[in-house]
């Protein structure tokens, strides 16, 4: 099913749900339920060019095989401070580390990257059966796999290495003569054979383009582009977001740094922060936190004044006049409060600066954009569910009065929930929802009027369901 922006008098060929947002006065809107951010990273380990859903440290350990404190996962850590779920995408990989662990037997890291150089293979005599050996895989000197075998060909791949070769396995000789393994499962520093030759690879524009192409079929609320000086890639990213929002009806927000996107779907981060451990989160790195925080914003929440967890200062303190100027340019900034030594969001705005009658200054506020996006995405989802359920029962939603009532009931239920939770006000299902058949009589034209709690007037929606 297709989505996008519906232009009155211009019907679209592909079946779908089309929204045309118009604002007639000042308004403010609260956020709906959200929480998923798509994030590309250049990590030193993991499967490449595939989205992996991470909602907890346990997810990370199980699905990626790294600890959350791994240096290459800085952006993930920042995003997870506020996001519910991170769709992690490793952009590229370098060479895979390897080592000969016995004559004619090789262990090779499962993935390319420098993390493979932290893998150690230890071969010890099995204490129960001296005809067998224990082949133990360690990562960062912690045991992650152990196999008891008689021959090399019995070895099976694990989450970290693959084995090739045949024949007997020679017990590892500790360099200092100490025991190769203790009962705790930790590897003495002088034992085992360390893999080597693993390298990282710098992502190219093609890698980021592949990321965007893959993201097109994923569901997320925000998506980050954590790159510094690459105007071409940033322009591609902005075009990607506009296409998703305006042509496909997927109302997401993109977060990048130091780029004048001039669009409500683009957040332009130009400030950075200093973490308590001394790590500098430059603007391009801060896109991960902003995307995570924007995705995880709760119902009726603005990020204005929300603290940046773990930050102790901003990278560049600026005076009031410069803050005002940069805000007018659509820049997302952080501010340092010397009174309580905290760092927080200066103002939750996007990059829109060219205002029109249809997109006034209220569209510069991410809080308002989030609720508009939530209404679009949620109603699209619910209308799809209605259509699918009818088809599952062997029929379609009829282009009749019964069909009109089906759709009206669905929308009424949804907007009533928003009103009950103080997201909108003065909702009148009799006067705020108008449904009619389209010109071809194969779908519905829906007019909606919605007034946010703190808005002076109502937003008007034109929706087509075919």
Curated annotation (Swiss-Prot):
What domain of life? Bacteria
Task: Note the coiled coil stretches, chain numbering.
Answer: none
The entry assigns this protein to a family as follows:
Belongs to the myoviridae tail sheath protein family.
Its recorded name reads Uncharacterized protein YqbK
Which lineage?
A: Bacteria, Bacillati, Bacillota, Bacilli, Bacillales
Encoding gene per record? yqbK
